[in-house]
Amino acid sequence: NLGRLGFLSENRPSAVASAILSGEYTVENRAMLKADVHTGNPELDEFPYALNEFTVHRSGAAMLGVEVSLDGVQLPTYWADGLIVSTSSGSTAYSLSAGGPIVLPESKVLIISPIAPHNLNVRPLVVPDNTEIRLRMHSRDENVIYTADNRTAVIPSGAEVGISVAQFSLKRVRLNRSNFIDALTEKLFWGED
């Protein structure tokens, strides 16, 4: 990501080459998510992984009910436009826009963030990254929109999705002179009136 807001873009492209050549970098591991779901979309079924998040979203006007279980323990049903399950890297992506917390990238957690929840007392939930998350959607609409980062598929409203941390991670170069807090300050204009 070389965009303005993407937090993986805290390294300026012009600075990367010289820092790598001079050894002024570290390699960090970023957790990836894996989904257990059949979407009918070969791109998603053959590579069921995401760096930032998986989302389920209503496909029409009817509200989406999402039953969530954490290691087999059932949570109250989320009634919302949708639900996001993100990594700590994804905490500054869609989850942040939906009111989720900012999480330092080295944190070993997953974030469950409702999208426009019907009940105002429903809040994002942070769970350990070794948690097995299962989602079951139901809606009066026939289908649900499912995404893995920016890849999209339509799945039946009764579908179930299992989400866990992948057995591999994304290797990312971080320049020694860059840090996440400075990137937050710069990109979110913290401290500016």
Model-predicted regions and their roles:
Residues 77-121:
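Gly/Ser/Thr-rich active-site loops/lids in small-molecule metabolic enzymes
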Residues 8-9, 95-97, 122, 173:
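Short glycine-/acidic-enriched loop or helix-start segments at secondary-structure transitions
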Residues 29-33, 50-52, 62-66, 81-83, ...:
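A generic structural signal for short beta-strands and their flanking turns/coil linkers
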Residues 43, 48, 56, 71-74, ...:
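ATP/nucleoside-binding phosphotransfer catalytic cores, i.e., glycine-rich phosphate-binding loops
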Residues 37, 58, 87-91, 116, ...:
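Glycine-rich beta-alpha junction loops
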Residues 4-81:
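Catalytic core of DAGKc-family lipid kinases
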Residues 68, 90, 146:
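Short aromatic-centered micro-motifs
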